[in-house]
Amino acid sequence: MDFVAGAIGGVCGVAVGYPLDTVKVRIQTEPKYTGIWHCVRDTYHRERVWGFYRGLSLPVCTVSLVSSVSFGTYRHCLAHICRLRYGNPDAKPTKADITLSGCASGLVRVFLTSPTEVAKVRLQTQTQAQKQQRRLSASGPLAVPPMCPVPPACPEPKYRGPLHCLATVAREEGLCGLYKGSSALVLRDGHSFATYFLSYAVLCEWLSPAGHSRPDVPGVLVAGGCAGVLAWAVATPMDVIKSRLQADGQGQRRYRGLLHCMVTSVREEGPRVLFKGLVLNCCRAFPVNMVVFVAYEAVLRLARGLLT
């Protein structure tokens, strides 16, 4: 049931967090936006509510699978550790047990998330590159006058969508191309998911009413939201490096590896570059993980009620 509960929680989290993800992507790829609220107002004015949910179908499928694997792996790993150490899978785990299980959960995710992360980053950076190319074509020395009947040539997009992007990367760069930046992804998800599950467990223990082993719904909301924020706080530096490595595609590559990317980025842009997107990620993480954990706990309680 942990796999099913994790999948349902993941889908609910996507439904809540996808609008902010859309805003984040548009801010990163469209220079016309001066800030978060400017992007929100413009998107709603032009496209209404559905504009915030464009392209939702693929993330729902992938996130539900990844969330299912994450929660399922965490619970099964924790049960095995408790069985080996205490002789009972339902024994109360220590913080070290929770940390180790959370880390294992994060590492297992990498195999599933790396290809989709590569496709997402390539498509986002492709959009930005196309916009820059259009501006150069319109303002350069060879720009076509406004009244010219023949429009300036605009490069065709290399990737036509997520699946086409995955197929193209696999064909041109091999299967290793689909796992580009996976070293940074391992470092990001390993310790961030250890933080995620440990902070959730500790906060649940603090917020549980006297005489109860689990918190009530408000307690789960607070614990889940705070766990998400703390996880993203420690994940953001490696998330920046991961994105830069994955965007560094075929041809003239800028980075030779994880360490070179980190050193080059910090030298050119300062240490603050490692925390780009931190505020928006944390703002999104709180409501998303509130919903994820409430849905997860609700499904588990429902299952226990049906089985007893």
Curated annotation (Swiss-Prot):
Keywords: Membrane, Mitochondrion, Mitochondrion inner membrane, Mitochondrion outer membrane, Repeat, Transmembrane, Transmembrane helix, Transport. It is a multi-pass membrane protein. One of its GO terms (cellular component) is mitochondrial inner membrane. Solcar repeats lie at residues 1-80, 93-206, 215-302. Induction: Down-regulated in hepatocarcinoma. The chain crosses the membrane at residues 3-23, 49-69, 98-116, 190-210, 217-237, 273-293. The keyword Nucleus does not apply. The keyword Transcription does not apply. Pfam families: Mito_carr (PF00153). It is found in: Mitochondrion inner membrane; Mitochondrion outer membrane. Its main location: mitochondrion. Gene3D superfamilies: Mitochondrial carrier domain. It catalyses: NAD(+)(in) = NAD(+)(out); acetyl-CoA(in) = acetyl-CoA(out). Specifically expressed in liver. InterPro entries: Mit_carrier, Mitochondrial_Carrier, Mitochondrial_sb/sol_carrier, Mt_carrier_dom_sf. One of its GO terms (molecular function) is transmembrane transporter activity. PANTHER family: MITOCHONDRIAL BASIC AMINO ACIDS TRANSPORTER-RELATED (PTHR45624), SOLUTE CARRIER FAMILY 25 MEMBER 47 (PTHR45624:SF3). Mitochondrial NAD(+) transporter that acts as a 'metabolic gate' in hepatic lipogenesis. Provides NAD(+) substrate to mitochondrial SIRT3 deacetylase and enables its NAD(+)-dependent activities in mitochondrial energy metabolism. This triggers downstream activation of PRKAA1/AMPK-alpha signaling cascade that negatively regulates sterol regulatory element-binding protein (SREBP) transcriptional activities and ATP-consuming lipogenesis to restore cellular energy balance. May transport other mitochondrial metabolites having an aromatic nucleotide and phosphate groups, such as acetyl-CoA. Belongs to the mitochondrial carrier (TC 2.A.29) family. This is Solute carrier family 25 member 47. It comes from Homo sapiens. The gene is SLC25A47.
